[in-house]
Regions:
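Short alpha-helical segments and helix-capping/turn motifs at coil-helix boundaries
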Residues: 5-8, 31-37
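A conserved hydrophobic secondary-structure block that centers on an alpha-helix together
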Residues: 1-13
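Short acidic/polar capping segments at secondary-structure boundaries
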Residues: 3-5, 27, 53-55
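Active-site and substrate-binding clefts of carbohydrate-active enzymes
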Residues: 33-279
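His/Asp/Glu-enriched short active-site or ligand-binding loop at hydrolase and phosphoryl-transfer sites
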Residues: 18-31, 155-160
Length: 279
C-alpha cells in the first residue's frame, strides 16, 4: 500500500538510490513523543524521517482545521451542484473563510514552533489533495502558513537540507510493518475483510515470478492488480463491487498473458512505461 514501510524493504530502497523515506512510527513511539523529531538510520538502507502525527492531526485529524464552521462544506450541494454552504450549514462567506484560514495558519505555526522549541525537525506530511480539494481554503491556509512562518521565525526546510544538520540515531530493533493508513498498520489492505484481495495478489505475484521472461504486459497487469485502491475501496465500502471486479479482471488478464503471451489486446500499455524491455 501507499506510504507503507517494512524493514525488509531497506536493502531494496538502498539499491534503488532512495536516500530517505517518511514513515509512520506513532504506534511504536507514542503520539507526541519527541523521538519523532529526530531522524533515524536503518541498518541496511535509507534515513527514516518520522512523520509527526500530533501536528498532522491539526489539519488532517477529526476536528482539525477543515472542520471549523466558516469553511466551505465539500459535501453540501445545491440542485445544480454548487457548494454554497458552510460547515455549520450557514451560507458560505468566502471573506470569513479566508479570515479563518489566516487565523488557523497563525495557530498552526505557533504550535509547530512550540513543538520544535528544543530542536528537531517536525515532518508535516499529508496527502496534498486535502489542500484545495477536500478543504477548499487549504491552499490559502498553506500560503498563510508560509507568511506566518516568516513572521514568527519558524524555519522551513527540505529533508535533504535537514539531513545535513541533524544527526540520525539508530532505528529501534523490531520495527514491524507500518503505513500512513488506518491504525498505522496494514489492516486496510490485508485485514480479514479484504484477505481475498491480498491472497489473490500474492498468488499472481508468485505465478509471474515462476514464469521465465514474463512480458511487459504481464508485469503491468500485476501492477494494476496490486493497486492499493482496490482493497482500500472494498475495506471502506466506497464503491460497491467495483474494486472486486477490477481486481478480478486484472488477475484474469495476467493469467491469460502468462498462458499465451502477446495473444490478447492490452488495455494497460500506458501503465509504467519504464517497464518496456525490463524482462
Amino acid at each position: 500500500p501507499e506510504c507503507a514501510y517494512a524493514p525488509w524493504l531497506d536493502p531494496a530502497l538502498e539499491r534503488a538510490g532512495v536516500r530517505a523515506v517518511c514513515v509512520e512510527l506513532t504506534n511504536a513511539l507514542g503520539l507526541g513523543s519527541e523521538r519523532h523529531l529526530q531522524p533515524m538510520r536503518s541498518a541496511d538502507g535509507p534515513l527514516l524521517w518520522l512523520i509527526d502525527r500530533a501536528v498532522i492531526a491539526l489539519a488532517w485529524g477529526q476536528g482539525g482545521y477543515p472542520s471549523r464552521p466558516p469553511y466551505r462544506d465539500y459535501h453540501a450541494y445545491t440542485t445544480h451542484r454548487h457548494r454554497v454552504r458552510r460547515i455549520d450549514g450557514g451560507r458560505y462567506d468566502h471573506v470569513a473563510a479566508t479570515r479563518q484560514a489566516r487565523a488557523d495558519a497563525a495557530e498552526f505555526v505557533s504550535a509547530v514552533r512550540a513543538r520544535v522549541r528544543d530542536g528537531g525537525v517536525c515532518v508535516f506530511a499529508i496527502d496534498t489533495e486535502l489542500l484545495g480539494h477536500w478543504w477548499y481554503e487549504g491552499v490559502q491556509w498553506l500560503d498563510a502558513v508560509l507568511d506566518e512562518a516568516d513572521r514568527q521565525g519558524l524555519a522551513l526546510t527540505t529533508l535533504d537540507a535537514a539531513r545535513e544538520h541533524h544527526e540520525a540515531v539508530p532505528a529501534p530493533a523490531g520495527l514491524g510493518s507500518t503505513s500512513w493508513g488506518e491504525g498505522g498498520d496494514l489492516r486496510t489492505w490485508s485485514g480479514p475483510k479484504v484477505a481475498a484481495f491480498a491472497w489473490r495478489a500474492r498468488a499472481a505475484e508468485l505465478a509471474l515470478a515462476a514464469t521465465p521472461n514474463p512480458s511487459d504486459r504481464a508485469l503491468r497487469e500485476l501492477l494494476a492488480l496490486q493497486s492499493s485502491d482496490w482493497a482500500f475501496l472494498a475495506d471502506w465500502e466506497l464503491a460497491g463491487d467495483y474494486p472486486e471486479q477490477r481486481a478480478q479482471l486484472h488477475a484474469e488478464a495476467l493469467a491469460r498473458e502468462l498462458r499465451d503471451p502477446g495473444a490478447h489486446e492490452s488495455k494497460v500499455r500506458g501503465l509504467a512505461p519504464w517497464l518496456a524491455g525490463w524482462s
